[in-house]
A protein has these predicted regions:
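FabD-like malonyl-/acyl-CoA
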Residues: 128, 342-346
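Glycine-rich phosphate-binding loop
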Residues: 339
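Short, charge-rich binding segments
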Residues: 44-46, 54-57, 103
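Short Gly/aromatic-enriched secondary-structure transition segments
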Residues: 39-46, 224-225
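Gly/Ser-rich oxyanion-binding loop with an adjacent helix/lid
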Residues: 1-22, 28, 32, 37, ...
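C-terminal nucleotide
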Residues: 2-27, 52-85, 182-331, 346-386
Length: 386
């Protein structure tokens, strides 16, 4: 990211004095999809694209913000019970409120920021913005006493209370805890996590953005969640002696016991979730051995499950996955909730340029617009730049 871009705008739009510069990254999730609300594992990593902000206390009770990307300026009082109307500024307002609830005496400050996280690519630009300001306020006003977990939870609470998005914790977790060259297996039940090496010599990791988003009738995500909960309910009824809260607690044998009762649709969805738990663990094992071929194979298996069992793919994403296979890409799958968005791809260096050229040409010919392609590198989490 461009430090000079932030500094020059900060000096221009405020009083000519410099502040501290902070950066928080967006994220990818290599594998572990639709597992968070089923108590399973996710496997994210921070990337080399994110939000960078220059921030300096201004000695007042007013927060003065400048969005470099939007060329927009917003001010609000730290203790204003309403907060700003501008949607982008509400993320920062929410973080101020959450940090104060954690005991940080937030005062007025000046801030200029920009981002290079591609919008609509499922890389969590909003979590990067929240994490950047939470980290900065902890440093500037809190003597860094607030824990990393509480910084991540402050971002999640901001989404819930001030934005109206009922998100999970993965995005903020990855932005705060990320490490260069490491992916993180997060247990969504216990919030325990472990770092795993991701140094794919001879490979590139890239996202291919279909730039489509299908709006479906009804509530497709709630439907799938209800399917999973229905399976758990039926298994729990057969095993009153055991404690079943999510599919994470269930075995393959128990799923087979209730197959006829729950019906094929609910069975297939639960089958995907149990398989995804096993695939995450297999990928962790493969990474410790440096076995990226197995990592790629599990990515393809996840795409198949998301498409055929969980049924959250779409024609465009399946097409991108097929083109990846045709080009000998090591691994490819849907990343994110589905029904549009991106695939994440593990591509050998020696075929990367050919793959980019081929997928761009074929997708454009079929759908009338080019996909966007973003190479990403697994990078450091939230930090002070200077």
């Amino acid at each position: 990211m461009d430090i000079e871009k932030v500094r020059s705008r900060f000096i221009k739009h405020f009083d000519g004095k410099t502040g501290n510069i902070y950066m928080s990254p967006g994220r990818i999730n290599l594998i572990g999809e639709h597992t968070d609300y089923n108590g399973g594992f996710v496997f994210p990593g921070a990337v080399d694209k994110g939000i960078m902000a220059e921030i300096r206390p201004n000695g007042t009770d007013t927060v003065m913000l400048y969005s470099i990307d939007l060329k927009d300026r917003v001010e609000f009082k730290v203790n204003d019970p309403e907060g700003p109307r501008a949607s982008w500024a509400r993320y920062i307002y929410g973080i101020c409120q959450e940090m104060m609830s954690l005991g940080v005496e937030v005062k007025g400050f000046n801030a200029a920021f920009y981002g290079d996280v591609p919008l609509g690519a499922g890389m969590s630009s909003s979590a990067a913005l929240e994490s950047c300001f939470a980290f900065a306020l902890n440093d500037l006003f809190g003597d860094n006493k607030v824990s990393k977990w509480d910084l991540a939870l402050a971002g999640q609470a901001t989404e819930h209370k001030y934005i109206g998005v009922n998100c999970g914790i993965m995005d903020q977790f990855a932005s705060v805890f990320g490490k260069e060259g490491k992916l993180m297996r997060l247990d969504c039940n216990s919030r325990e996590f472990e770092y795993f090496p991701f140094n794919p010599q001879g490979y590139k990791l890239c996202l291919v953005n279909s730039k489509v988003k299908h709006e479906l009738a009804g509530s497709p995500y709630n439907d799938r969640r209800n399917s999973c909960e229905n399976v758990v309910k039926h298994i729990a009824a057969k095993h009153p002696e055991a404690k079943f809260e999510t599919l994470r607690d269930c075995t393959w044998e128990q799923l087979e016991e209730v197959r006829a009762e729950v019906g094929e649709e609910d069975y297939s969805r639960a089958h995907f979730v149990l398989g995804e738990k096993d695939r995450v663990l297999a990928v962790c094992d493969a990474l410790e051995k440096g076995d990226y071929e197995t990592v790629g194979q599990k990515m393809y298996e996840t795409h198949y499950g998301l498409s055929k069992e969980y049924e959250v793919s779409c024609e465009e994403l399946d097409f991108l996955n097929d083109v990846a296979k045709e080009n000998g890409v090591t691994g490819s799958r849907i990343m994110g909730g589905g029904f549009g968005g991106c695939t994440i791809n593990l591509v050998k260096d020696d075929i990367y340029d050919k793959f980019v050229e081929d997928v761009t040409a074929k997708f454009t010919a079929k759908y009338g617009h080019a996909p966007e392609i973003y190479p990403v590198v697994i990078s450091e989490g939230s930090h002070k730049v200077c």
